[in-house]
């Protein structure tokens, strides 16, 4: 277990909050990260991975999934999207390929993000 200073990688320090509760320096652990994204940038699990924790990373975007596979080969990295029912669906990816959602016009997404989205 690591006793190095805890470095936050998460966008809003969610990893710090979790570390206070889960104490990753004192025990081994396991996570399931749905919408894992980049393995370092804004990652809630990067600091835990540095401390020997492993997990399942669910990430449907190809580029992000490839990064996860390269950086976290000991993890289970799944290139899938999760939903309420089994089957196949459509995934709309914004032009920067940083975000995706299950429909062409989700009400919780700004219009500018929906413009130019590609169907995957």
Residue ranges and their predicted role:
Residues 1-120:
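Phosphate/nucleotide-binding beta-alpha loop and adjacent structural elements of enzyme active sites
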